[in-house]
Structures are given as structure tokens and as C-alpha cells.
Regions:
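Acidic, two-metal ion nucleic-acid-processing modules in DNA metabolism proteins
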Residues: 381
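N-terminal regions that are enriched for targeting/export leaders
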Residues: 1-45
Length: 396
């Protein structure tokens, strides 16, 4: 789709690391839609999914615990997500000044003491000269909700999820950021008892993010006898998408400037690509549970990592063999069988050449834990055909 931009707009687009043809391609997708994934079949146990026995889980946990002491292990946490969606319904109530009798307001009132932010909210609200006891049980509850969400109070609607009080314990509350400190200490501890955590954050919240992390770091290092190495990055603006009007024309803000919106989490692959580690655990900032429930998480994370290390060892050995010697037909079949059965690689021929095998093996290995499909929304594992005709197992 051809779009006319002014010279200043072209300079603005290029300064962000993008180009006019790339922006035009985005608008073509808006107009014509995106092609559907060519799903061949759902992945099932034995066909894309490996189901570990209890003995295998114990074995791979042991593999990981023995080898992790000599490895650089990184926890990669996409953390730029704002909390606005969590409070969308409440924000609508504040914006429209009601209705106070709505179900969401009643639920908020009934459950207010169960929220991790309750004490902070009440303290801040009363410090502002308000009466909590009278307002929580009257129409003035809307003022409490506004104090929770807006800049004059806790500003939760505009903060990233990482900075919210997330979980309540008997003697403390924790943010989602702190829960990632705990998780890292439990399963992402590498050599020299070092836990590397990398957070992707939005530029406007970077300073607040760093301030919270640094203020809590020493406390959790002492509590779990680890050393945290923290790093941060922001999403590359070149991956942003130009907003469009309903007429599929470039959207301009109230100052007349083009408005770009951040891409989805898939855009963070570039951030990940710039990091170096032997093993990388990937987990969203809000995908954490309380520490008293964490044992299953630790078990399966370690088992997955141990299985990854076993696959790596086999794959690396086969790659070295491919590089250094001329393989026999039987050796090629052995390696191809490993790639098909263990790495879910589909070859175009039942008798792949040595070079084809090496090309398929020479790539990162990703292990994804699967949960039983019980009708919940979200992606799932499928065998997918790409435009070039190749078939691979993907999360769709």
C-alpha cells in the first residue's frame, strides 16, 4: 500500500530504525490481513510432545543440578507490560463516575483486604486526609478506586506489573519483580551461586524499575545465599508499528506527530539475541506464584533444563562429527533419527545428506513445557507448514 509521508515524517521513521517500505508493508497487512498458519495437525504425546516419567524427571533434575554449577544461567523476563489491562473495568468506573452498584465495584469492596496492595492503599488514602472506614462503605468508594489507579494516589493503572504489590505473605508483601528474584534463586543459579536476570522494560519506567530492583537485591541475596547480576533492555523502536486510523491511514497524535505502538513480545527476540548464556529461562513478569506453591515450578524447570542439556550434548557431539569426518550412510541415518525423534526436526527426505543434517542441527534448542488443554484461552502446540514447504512444531 502506497502512503505519502512528508520529509519530516520520513526522517522520523528512519530515525527509529525503520523504513517507509516496512511501514507500508504493515499497512498492507492491516488492509488485507495476515495469512493464516498452515496447521497440519495438533502436536500430541509421542508426536511432538514428550511425556516424562517420574524416573526421567528425577534423572534430568539430577543432570541439571550437577552441571548447572559450571554454567552461566540467565532468566529472561519480558517486563514492559503495563497494569492497565488488569484494572480496565475499574478505570472505566472512575472515568464514567459509576455505576457504583456495578458487580465489579461490589467485588472490589468485598475482596479489598485480600489484595496485596491493601495496606499500602489504605495508608496512602488516609494520609491524604480521607476516611477509609466511611468511604469504603459508601458511594465514595469510587474515590478509593481512583486513588489506587491514578497519579494522585498509587498510580497502579500506569505502572508496569513488575512494580505492583503482587502477593501477600504472613509478614510481608512482594512485587512480581521480587518473586522473580525468588524463582531465580530456586532454579536459575549458575556457577559461583550467581543468578543472572535480564528484564525488558519500557523506557519511561526504567529508572523506577532499577530503583526497586537495587533496593531489594541485597535482601534476597542474603536470604537465598546467591548473587544477582541484573541487566535491562528496552524494546527496539524499529520493531514498533505505526498506528492506523479506521480508514487505514497513518494516525497522528494531538501534536500532529506519527504515533507508533510497541510490537508484541515476539519483537523481544532481538533483545534475547544480544545476550549470552549457556541456558536461558524465559518467563513473563506476571507469570509467578507464591513461594509456598513454587515446588512444582522448580521441579519442572529443572527437569526441562536437564533434558535440554542432554539434547545439547548429543547435538553438539553429532555436529562435531559432521564437521570433522565423512559419515557413512548408517551414521547419517542415526543422526537424522535423533534429530527427528528428539528435536522434532522434519527432513524433506528420508535420507538426508550430511550437509542437510548439519544445517538443521546448527541452531538454538528450545524446550517448552506443555499443560493439558482444558479449554482455556491461549496458544497450543501444532505441526505447521511454512511458506517454503518445511514443517516444524510450533506454539500457535
Amino acid at each position: 500500500m502506497k502512503i505519502t509521508f512528508t520529509p519530516d515524517e520520513i526522517a522520523f521513521i528512519e530515525a527509529r530504525g525503520s523504513s517507509v517500505p516496512e511501514v507500508e508493508a504493515q499497512f498492507t497487512y492491516f488492509e488485507k490481513g495476515f495469512p493464516f498458519a498452515d496447521l497440519q495437525r495438533a502436536a500430541t504425546i509421542g508426536d511432538g510432545i514428550k511425556q516424562m516419567t517420574a524416573e526421567e524427571i528425577a534423572h534430568y533434575i539430577n543432570v541439571y543440578e550437577q552441571k548447572s554449577k559450571e554454567l552461566e544461567i540467565l532468566k529472561f523476563v519480558p517486563a514492559s507490560g503495563a497494569a492497565s489491562r488488569m484494572f480496565k473495568e475499574l478505570q472505566t468506573i472512575v472515568n464514567e463516575k459509576g455505576p457504583i452498584e456495578s458487580e465489579i465495584v461490589q467485588k472490589f469492596r468485598e475482596n479489598i483486604k485480600n489484595f496485596a496492595f491493601y495496606s499500602n492503599l489504605r495508608r496512602s488514602y488516609e494520609k491524604s486526609g480521607n476516611s477509609w472506614e466511611s468511604d469504603i462503605n459508601s458511594d465514595k468508594i469510587i474515590n478509593i478506586i481512583a486513588h489506587l489507579l491514578e497519579e494522585t494516589g498509587l498510580n497502579y493503572s500506569n505502572l508496569p506489573k513488575a512494580l505492583l504489590q503482587f502477593h501477600t505473605y504472613s509478614n510481608e508483601t512482594r512485587t512480581a519483580l521480587e518473586e522473580h528474584f525468588v524463582e531465580a534463586a530456586r532454579y536459575a543459579r549458575g556457577k559461583n551461586d550467581e543468578c543472572k536476570l535480564h528484564f525488558t522494560v519500557s523506557p519511561q519506567h526504567l529508572s523506577g524499575f532499577q530503583a526497586l530492583a537495587e533496593s531489594k537485591k541485597a535482601e534476597y541475596e542474603e536470604r537465598y545465599n546467591v548473587r544477582y547480576q541484573l541487566s535491562y533492555s528496552t524494546q527496539d523502536p524499529a520493531t514498533d508499528t505505526l498506528a492506523a486510523t479506521e480508514e487505514n491511514l497513518p494516525f497522528h497524535d494531538n501534536k500532529g506527530n506519527l504515533l507508533f505502538r510497541p510490537g508484541g513480545h515476539g519483537a523481544l527476540i532481538q533483545n534475547l539475541n544480544h545476550l549470552s548464556a549457556d541456558i536461558v529461562f524465559v518467563k513473563n513478569i506476571d507469570n509467578v506464584i507464591t513461594e509456598n506453591q513454587i515446588s512444582d515450578t522448580v521441579t519442572y524447570k529443572k527437569a526441562l533444563a536437564g533434558y535440554l542439556l542432554w539434547l545439547q550434548e548429543k547435538s553438539f557431539a553429532y555436529q562435531e562429527k559432521c564437521k570433522k569426518t565423512q559419515l557413512t550412510d548408517d551414521e547419517c541415518l542415526e543422526i537424522q533419527h535423533f534429530a527427528e525423534e528428539k528435536l522434532q526436526i522434519v527432513f524433506s527426505s528420508p535420507n538426508a545428506t550430511q550437509n542437510e543434517i548439519l544445517a538443521q542441527l546448527h541452531r538454538p534448542i528450545r524446550i517448552c513445557g506443555m499443560v493439558k488443554n482444558e479449554g482455556e484461552p491461549g496458544g497450543g502446540p501444532f505441526w505447521v507448514k511454512s511458506c517454503d514447504g518445511s514443517i516444524s512444531c510450533q506454539i500457535i
